[in-house]
Amino acid sequence: MADPTGISLAFGDDTLEPNPVWTRIDDPSVLPGVRVAGYQIDRGRASETTRTEGGSATVTITDRDGALDPTNPTGPFTTPTNKIQPLVQAAICRWNPVDLVWDTRFRGWVAEYDYTFDPSQQVNQLQLTLVDIFEILATVEMYPGGDFGDPPPAGSEGQVYYGAPATVDQANYRIERILTDARLGTLAGTVFTSAFAVVFSLNVNVWPATYSPGETALAAIQETVDAELPEIANAFTDRFGRLAVHGRQAKFNPGGVLAGPPPIDNTVWDWHHWYVGDGDFVNLNPAAHAQIRQFAFNHGRQYLANSAMAYPVSVTDATMNGQVYPAAGTATPSKTKYGIRSWSAPNLITAQGRYLSGGVTTVTDALTETHRFAQYKVANYGLPVDRITTIGFRPLLPADPRAGAVHRLLGKADISDQVDVTVPSPGGGGFNGAVFFIEGIHETCTGRLRGGVAAGAEGYDDVTLTLDVSPGPVDTSMFTPPP
């Protein structure tokens, strides 16, 4: 089926139809009385230290003819197979006036239609509230009886159980199992196929896990992701509306993950490395550097951690002390300077770490692997760093030599992309190619622009894009393959 364009809904398709038929509702040649006044998109998380939550979007519409009014008996969307109703698929796409392509910015489902009658009764105001795949997964409760998991061992009857006693699963396989049980994909052997999820670059094996009846599929997935490396491994919704599950190497070495083995193509992960900065930086290479329009940063104590502990569910009282890093009683410059700033990751289902080197996979045990999580935390958060709190972008006229870079960023920037920032400040400070990664995305559109666009051609969104970003890791040496 054709990809969505503009603001599109899939009126006639089921909620989980993998190839929906899209109707663009802001196309005046299709629905001349419908005008989109604007939209707001919010996805991701504020920083890497919080768990990613579901994304949402709102679309504000003026409906002069009642085309999108479900009480209109003669409207175009009233038949049983082509009807205005909740949980139809929805997409928000942005036109790139330089490259002349549509870029999907949000894909999900209509949660709510909210109608406000104008006092003149000549027009309706409609607000669409959209949700993403997290909402779908959060409403899938896991029940015993065969739909979810494996036959439970003795003593766990009545629970939902994944795994087999005394065995381990690869983390990506566990997540694919859960998604398959939730009817969001299929597994043929070890080959997972889904229109709604992509899972890759996980580097650990996980213990069997037991869930109480009523726990959600989303909670089980997030627990498995945390086994890879809490905070750094991530499950989020990408701009195509898919649940994207990335392991730690997707941040440590994105180029290596893309290269493989196995290689990852851009239909699975449309990763970009952006170069952004002030006007002087953009003028060095207008075709490749995108101009920042809003910028602020913080240098504070919030993310400091100089004493950490991470341990698996298999830990014992006798081995617990060994999971602290640095070891108890060890003095460090950070502790001396700032006092103890603690972080912990308890009861992880991590069973083994997997390391591929020279075509050979070696494994670490659960205690060793989770201890590395504590090492990573202290190595990368033991000192305060400069964190960007505001970074924003705006469109330019299509003929501007700087327009191509910024319109590509406006259309294709996504969670997990790398952003190198160059913004000098008075006195010689500032940022010079500082590496950050996108954690969250916020987009506010207040209408359409036609500057520099020929009569009858597609306009482009009057949009402000702001990003939540995290600093790139400083030290990942603890995750090198064992000798």
Predicted segments, located by residue:
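Surface-exposed cap/loop segments at beta↔alpha junctions
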Residues: 1-18, 28, 36, 42, ...
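Positively charged, low-complexity intrinsically disordered regions
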Residues: 90, 95, 240-243, 342, ...
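Short polybasic amphipathic segments
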Residues: 1-15, 19, 23, 90, ...
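Residues in intrinsically disordered, low-complexity segments of regulatory proteins
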Residues: 21, 94, 101, 108, ...
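Charged- and aromatic-enriched interaction segments used to assemble
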Residues: 98-102, 119-301
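An acidic/polar, Gly/Ser/Thr-rich interaction patch typically located in mid-to-C-terminal regions
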Residues: 44-78, 200-238, 275-483
